[in-house]
Amino acid sequence: MSQIENQWEQIKHIETGIMRHMLALGLDWNDEVAMARLARECKTFSAAHAQAVYASGDRTRKTRAELFAMVSIMIKTMEEAANENRDVHGGDVWKAFAKHLYS
């Protein structure tokens, strides 16, 4: 498998994880208000927040933390592809969320 095919597969896999976590949280990626709220929360989420979440044992908070980790991995994967002049992008779920993340 070529590098570009591997990056496409990674992005599809990450986006599937993001979608599953959104579904588990009862979030609709077509809901602009919910996606904007989620993006604001994601922008301020830190390693200290993650430690507190995992210490709490709260499954819903853990699911959110995992979602934010996947968002970070998605961004990193896309940055690596861009640095190699490769054109990769997420699908509908990623686009619905990312437009709020970057605004």
Predicted feature descriptions by range:
Residues 1-6, 100-103:
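Short intrinsically disordered terminal tails
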